[in-house]
Amino acid sequence: MNSKRGMFTREYLWRSIVTMCGLFVIVITLGIGGFLVYKGSGTFLKFHHSIGEFLFSSDWAPVDNMEGGGKVGTLIFIVGSLSTCGLALLIATPFALGSAIFMTEIAPKFGEKFYRPVIQIFAGIPSVVYGWVGLTVLVPFIRDIFHRQVGHSILAAGLVLAIMIFPTITSVAADAIRAVPKDYRMGAYGMGSTRWQTIYKIVLPASASGIFSGIILGLARAFGEALAVAMVDRKSVV
């Protein structure tokens, strides 16, 4: 009886601790959101800028004084972010999915011992390093290829972001594919399916939700990497 009561007490204690931690995170998140709303509302309430101007105007020339004024159109930044992240996903996703299939289905021993650690190392490289490589290598390359005066562009930013999110998508997709039960593969082979038929018709559909989660995580990282994008894209387009 005492042992059961002790187990119940410990379970209740740990459940309370986890609940408080979760509530703490929620409160902090709401506090950050409230602070941003409070500070940003002055743009509309105090300086009388409209939401339509803020969202649908491309004129960005704010005035740094107590009276406010200027122009605060963010459309160019919204379109630039969406274009850059979309281009990065289009470039990175096929290569990441192919790499995940290679390291789990084609060469699992090589993938586990060599390829996976390399991917994890690339995932831990700071964004400033990617931005510096893009600035010193990719930007001059694009300038020479397209005969532009300046190589800073959405193409350069998209390529840098694609390289940055490639390890994230690859790692999550590989884990999702690896989690597919072995019985699925054995059943497909028993019915006469080839390796590629098994991968395409059995493994990928079974791991689709995990692969999609990897793509979403890659997209989230792409939206958050402002430093690398700022180094290679200066409001110009290809």
Describe every region a protein language model picked out:
Residues 1-82:
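N-terminal, non-cleaved signal-anchor transmembrane helix
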Residues 72-102:
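Transmembrane alpha-helix signature in integral membrane proteins
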Residues 120-158, 162:
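Generic hydrophobic transmembrane alpha-helix motif, especially the helices
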